[in-house]
């Protein structure tokens, strides 16, 4: 199986900066970051191997969730539309829903962001507060999804303010405080 690493810390502790650095969106002031033996910034394929949720994704608000995912999927020369339907169902969204994303609740947009992160079956998932805005049932469904991804040998890095999410899901937990990372 895979591994789930948890990241906790107060607002402003540096969690999002760390995630952006892991993703290669920010460069390190000193040293380097490697994930699965690949040095971030030097290996351009890293971003292609990761499913990422860092902040509110920039979905096209007048398009449906399905059409947003379809657009991103076809940009990558993927054509299996049935797969998109199954991904939406897996995160608890009705693929036939034609409502524009701008009319989605926060929880529905979060489910769509999770669908985007997992739709290409990446080996690595980098998830900043993936359960944000979800109701109790949604949290349960996404926890189950993440545990399935772990069983599929995925590497998951998960930040959460909800200690229960961390305790239920994570194999190892790290704390960010004042820009310093330490294992708990």
Task: Write out the residue ranges for each language-model feature.
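H-loop/switch region of ABC-family ATPase nucleotide-binding domains
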Residues: 160-161
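Helix-to-loop junction immediately C-terminal to a conserved catalytic motif
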Residues: 23
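Catalytic Walker B motif of ABC-type/P-loop ATPase nucleotide-binding domains
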Residues: 125-129
